[in-house]
Amino acid sequence: ALVQALIRHAQDEDLSSLHLLFAQDRDVQACADAGLMLRHTVQFHWHNRSYRDFGHFLSDLQQEKRKKIRQERRKVTEAGIRFRHSMGQDITDADWGFFYQCYERTYLEHGNPPYLNRDFFARLARVMPQQWLLFVAERDGIPVASSLIALDPERGVAYGRYWGALERVDCLHFEACYYQPLEWCIAHGFQRFEGGAQGEHKMARALMPVRTTSVHWLAHPAFAEAVERFLERETDGIGGYLDQLAERSPLRHGHAG
């Protein structure tokens, strides 16, 4: 009933489309039952297999992958980089300000203006402070990079969101965006870390491929029909793609999430 009400609302408002992303399985099923289109894609997630610490996690990886991660972490340490992290209301205004510098720099380096402004993050800090975890990389006490992680404490899930650096340090991106968050997840009993869309390279850090589903409704019948045909072909390929990725598992026994 809710899905049909949404469609009627979209039609009444002359909207061209409706989209539901990152939905719960029951909501996806309700939309499918109502005839909406489903799109299957792949993301890369890390799963906590009751690891005691980061070393225990590394022992779950193939020897080559363990060696690579240790080398990358050593490069950051030898560059004089140290990390600190803050959560919730412990994130100071100065930390938020520095983070925004990093966030802005990332976009400007790619020739784009940042699509979120400083006030947006200030509101997040006020309205939902406990959902944020900030890592700050420092050299000699001076901040040089940061990464912002979103948290869902009830489900034990962390989401890699934004990162940026004011200077280039070899392997700093991997440390700030993967190894520090994973170490934190292990220490705090979080069960999953989602590193965002795309990126088969994330498998080298034990983020494993997971099928995700989004829901779509298009108002124009001919356009909807064309998209539906495309999605049918795309879905056929997703299964094969997941099988190929599973063969490249970095885990010692090839087990997936």
Segments the model singles out, each with a brief description of its role:
Residues 1, 157, 222-225:
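Conserved acyl-donor/pantetheine-binding loop and adjacent beta-alpha core of acyl/acetyltransferases
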Residues 1-8, 168-185, 194:
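Conserved acetyl-CoA-binding loop-helix of GNAT-fold acetyltransferases
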Residues 3-171, 216-217, 232, 249-257:
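A conserved beta-strand-loop-helix scaffold within acyl/acetyltransferase catalytic domains
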Residues 13-21, 185-197:
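Conserved GNAT acetyl-CoA-binding A-motif
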Residues 97, 101, 158, 175-183, ...:
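Feature representing long, continuous alpha-helical segments
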Residues 127-130, 141-142, 150-155, 172, ...:
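A structural signal for short secondary-structure junctions
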Residues 189-194, 198-233:
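C-terminal structured "cap/appendage" subdomains that terminate the fold
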Residues 219, 224-257:
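In a subset of proteins, long, contiguous C-terminal domains/tails are tracked
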